């Protein structure tokens, strides 16, 4: 009998063996913040390319951005159109305007996160009202597990309504406060809130302030959950339902993030969303031929530059003109009076930037950025220097961590009004600094194969967890922690009791 050759065996395994391992997966993807959408879509596409049956609930909060899904490998997309209430809430652009004007204090983060929470809540309520569109299409399918990012928490209710208890939590940033708290991974007294401006550690005098940042995220979660739990008719709170999750994957890298307590069911996959750079178009090549030093300026898609306060715009343009030998390429999303007035000289305005292509060209001397997680990882991968101006959310923490890890300089948002401070920051960011360059080179080298490594880690972990395993381990028996609100109440009660006691002692001693 003739033995099968090695190529024949490989062909049989790839074409007939893989389907035996095929899993049916439900992915919940709210279309709201582009970087989050891209991260979740990348995971869905990866699983589809692997041969798994992937169904995506595409909950469209913003129709102006793509869902980033590869329809050639996705089995089914259940699309939920934008709620009229959500369209109305987003139309006035009050949220990005607030991002530009707010201070990074717990009360202000709480206020703007509540605005976001209400938008997610309204869209989820609309989704629930579309019973026939969503649940009737999905209830006849048997899913092995679900995948969602616990930012918009509608996915928790969808999974519970469909009887999906096994799930994977994603985070396109670092670990989210409420998730860490709900799963019992580590205490809020130890961990800097993702909304805070603390890095690897919290100073003693900052403990209460950090707890208030944690409380702001809890409020964002509860703005949604308090209404959605009865709407989905869940038998347990959304917070408790999170504990049935089996795995969590974070868009972080150990050399670029803070050190913190960990769990064996939590994995870092920073770099999994890296894109392959394309050759630069002639317009950029021609620009680069005119200048030896190029500075890229972009504050992300959620906080467009045209909504920036005028005083910041004027400071930046005046400062840029003080560097005549540098070309500044500024992502500015519309033509307006400001761009018309400042088109001359060494500043070029672009509504869209091929950011990865520009960074990987090795022509960029400095990237002035808002410090979003994806942007930072892409920049570190390209070994490009950054000047971070954090605006909202996790960006303040990202900036502080990068500063503490010797990877970047930081220019605070309110400093954008001071031309001398902006000038000094750009000068510092472009001057010789061997320690900074060595740190960036080390991180860049470690990120070189991060995409492939992260993809392999994700696929191997997910497949080993859910293939032929009816009861994979979860977070159900992890310790239950006090909430940030409870700890704040205890601390404030102790402080009030102590103050009252001291007051009584002083009164008795000096007045009686």
UniProtKB/Swiss-Prot annotation:
Keywords, sorted A to Z: Glycosyltransferase, Membrane, Signal, Transferase, Transmembrane, Transmembrane helix
Keyword Transmembrane found: yes
Superkingdom of this protein's organism: Eukaryota
Keyword Ubl conjugation among record annotations: no
Gene3D superfamilies per the UniProt record, alphabetical: Glycogen Phosphorylase B (3.40.50.2000)
EC number(s) reported in the record: 2.4.1.17
Reaction catalysed by this enzyme: glucuronate acceptor + UDP-alpha-D-glucuronate = acceptor beta-D-glucuronoside + UDP + H(+)
CDD domains hit by this protein: GT1_Gtf-like
Molecular functions (GO terms): glucuronosyltransferase activity; UDP-glycosyltransferase activity
Transmembrane segments: 487-507
A Gene Ontology term for the protein's cellular component: membrane
Name of one Pfam family that matches: UDPGT
Signal peptide: 1-22
Enzyme kind, highest EC tier: transferase
Protein topology in the membrane: Single-pass membrane protein
Subcellular location: Membrane
Family, similarity comment: Belongs to the UDP-glycosyltransferase family.
PANTHER family hit by this protein: EG:EG0003.4 PROTEIN-RELATED (PTHR48043), UDP-GLUCURONOSYLTRANSFERASE UGT-55-RELATED (PTHR48043:SF34)
Record protein name field: Putative UDP-glucuronosyltransferase ugt-55
Gene (UniProt): ugt-55
